[in-house]
Amino acid sequence: MKRALAILVLSLAGCRTSEPAGADPPPQKTEPAAHVAGIGEKATGVELADAPDGDVAAIVRAARDQARAKKRTLLVYIGATWCEPCKRFHYAAERGQLDAEFPTLSLLVFDLDRDGDRLKVASYAPGYVPYFGVPGDDGKATSNAMEGSIKGEGAVKNIVPRLGRLLSGAP
């Protein structure tokens, strides 16, 4: 009987955890995918790749590596669904209207309203959209960026030369 009691006590003691009952498990750190879909997949012209969920700096680093491997230049692009110049630029890029001007440009696309909080963690906090930024080697924002545009039919014509100047200094 003493032996059975001793086994019971020892087995119950082995089941005890240091966590209180009902405690949530610690959060797991999620790593971004090693591959960002849409980066480096287009042979020539502007490519728009929606940024996946996760740590912005890590995603940007992965996307930049992919773009470089394909001899493309990556910029972080932040737009918004309510931004008229963003819509006009996006439309022109999707239809290949900017391919001749920017044959090796890859844009990692974020939405300011959806992604704003996680963008701030990586120092991407534009005052205006659209925002185009050259990422640093750490995946965070650099001062090499441009933001904002005029509204109306001239929006794309306003963005293109400024974007060209930005790219001329991009690594």
Give the residues covered by each predicted segment.
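Non-catalytic, surface beta->alpha helical segment in thiol-disulfide oxidoreductase systems
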Residues: 127-171
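Bacterial signal peptide processing site
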Residues: 14-18
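Short, low-complexity, disordered segments immediately C-terminal to signal peptides
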Residues: 19-32
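Sec-dependent bacterial lipoprotein signal peptides
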Residues: 1-13
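Typically the conserved alpha-helix immediately C-terminal to a functionally engaged Cys/Sec
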Residues: 86-101
